[in-house]
């Protein structure tokens, strides 16, 4: 059963229900409340000597005249002298006509053939009255109006038959003859009405019921045509709502009958705060019951109005031009209404895409995000990491985000990024968990990989964010930005590891003049070079094998898109592919990479001590102490080398195994294996 959305609607006046003379119920109720209440005696003339006579007391020709007179009344729902209405309480709309059992059997049989038509009329008439109340919705109002027009024709036919009867030209066989053509149509309408009343159908439910009944009557052209006419009349009000939606983007639905629901609690501002991007998918949504003739195009109708609404909220009040609008009708040649809806959808799609691309420069905004969050232009980041080193080395709970923001602004203003007017939309943030922990909220990861929160520094949790205004937030939503941030955090930490190893390499280069052949310094230098080659290979893979190619694919696709949904689809596909290509959706590979980076950082931090110890060893004159200390330094370097090579070699099989399902890992595997063979 379809229920209407609880929307305030006008109340039917009490006097319209309490006064039967306004509805015609007095014809049916006055006699039922008097002498026909319990047991009824049939009389011919109430002014006779008080003796009530049954119809069987009269001759057959007289009985026929009396029966015809009563049948003409029964055809419009009024009891006669010898024909009464029996109502069965407990069964909704259950009524039956009865005759005086003393009536001639032939006349009884003919009368009973006409009784169904009388019952159908009563049922339809009651439905017309009840459905005309405000609460039943526009579709029921329109359906009731069409039925009322049909009943007027029916009543005109009864009036003509009565005229013939008064002229003495109508027999009971003639009455049956004239009633037969209406029997099938009234039966079909009564069946529809009974089902609609029982299940309390409104809106789409009524239209679907009418259409299904029309299809079921395919063998009876006249009945099918009538039901199709009723469907067309009932759908006019519904199509008026549809027209405003696809042509103006407005839901003018006072009784909640339309198949598109609006969630007013969701605001456009939520796109920059809600990580699930509910606004675009749930602000307007499809209800369960959709008219059958619109089922295949319901999604198109939904997006058409959504596009027009987005433009309206941008202050760009665009409507489908009057010259391009056509009256939507269900029945017609070649389903003209489908062509109208598709034309309106194409217009709204192109207008919104052009608005976002041209006025709001979507591609330029995406390119700006690529510069900063995907490190396409990293000069500002180098400067920032230099001036923010002290703050980033603090524990997470000790970091001042305000200070980091000031340092970020300084780095942006003093580098090439200052020429970009969008750099002011860049902000910094510090997460409370490591990258593995953050990803663990979405993916199953080993609990051993989750680090102690107290040991995490800003270097593992620092990230950038980007202010995105409406309507670009439809495409670059909070959910999309969170994906950018995951990629940025991984790249940022890789850059940090590379900088630390470069510092260690510079220390080694500073002592090249020393004779280090066969010493721990030489071994340390080779290890540093291998580590630097590893992290450089990883960054090269991330940048040139993953981010750049996927960016160009997305950029090319955006040039030919014709709807915002396609734009969102291409952008989300780009981000998901980058996340997977950057190993962030592959826990086994990512944990190996994090372990290797951790070893590199530990080695880089120990380099100063290792080098200074090696220099001191060469300058000392006590052989025994020199040997012990040299052994300690050499053993430390061996431990770093052994751990690094072990992790690197174990990464190879993981990448080879993963490359069967993820072919792009083959490129990374080639780089990594190249490092391990050196």
Curated annotation (Swiss-Prot):
MF-aspect GO terms: gamma-tubulin binding
Keyword tRNA-binding appears in the UniProt entry: no
Triggers nucleus envelope localization, as annotated region: 63-116, 118-180, 290-318, 472-548, 587-622
Family: Belongs to the TUBGCP family.
General function of this protein: Gamma-tubulin complex is necessary for microtubule nucleation at the microtubule organizing centers (MTOCs). Required for the positioning of the gamma-tubulin-containing complex on pre-existing microtubules and for the proper organization of cortical arrays.
Assembly: Part of the gamma-tubulin complex. Gamma-tubulin complex is composed of gamma-tubulin and GCP proteins (e.g. GCP2 and GCP3). Interacts directly with GCP3.
Protein name stated in the entry: Gamma-tubulin complex component 2
This protein's encoding gene: GCP2
